[in-house]
Regions:
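Vicinal oxygen chelate
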Residues: 13-19, 75-119
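A short acidic/small-residue loop/turn micro-motif
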Residues: 105-106, 129-131
Length: 131
């Protein structure tokens, strides 16, 4: 079993009400299928089904004072077709400022991605690349 180099991602959001449905649509498409947290509490999120140390966890914490910034979280997928498919999920789920899917040769020769923001304007990306 390979080790996940990240323990977790803890993204701040201004409002659970704004983003929960978006992440409930997006995260399972990226392999985060086990949900944590609930309607009450300070955080919510999902993990992959692997055991530790391979488990990946993406959480979000409600912080009404949070201000989105230029940081971006990028998710890697296996194929360009997955980028296309997840781009459609993002549109249906209420993603904002969607760019692509498209080739982005300014990053690398085979960089193919969709760039977008969640409903709280946090920057995200889904990318396929082989180098």
């Amino acid at each position: 079993m390979s080790r996940n180099p990240f323990s977790h991602i803890d993204l701040r959001v201004r409002s659970f009400a704004n983003v929960t449905g978006f992440y409930q649509a997006l995260l399972p498409e990226l392999g985060f299928t086990v949900w944590w947290g609930g309607e009450e509490g300070e955080w919510r999120g999902a993990s992959t089904e692997e055991s530790f140390p391979g488990k990946a966890f993406f959480g979000f914490t409600e912080d009404p004072g949070h201000r989105p910034n230029a940081s971006c979280i990028a998710f890697w997928v296996n194929t360009r077709e997955e980028v296309d498919r997840i781009g459609e999920v993002v549109k249906r789920a209420g993603g904002k400022n969607i760019e692509g899917p498209a080739d982005s040769p300014e990053y690398s020769r085979d960089y193919y991605a969709v760039f977008f923001e969640d409903p709280d304007v946090n920057r995200l990306e889904v990318v396929h690349r082989t180098q």
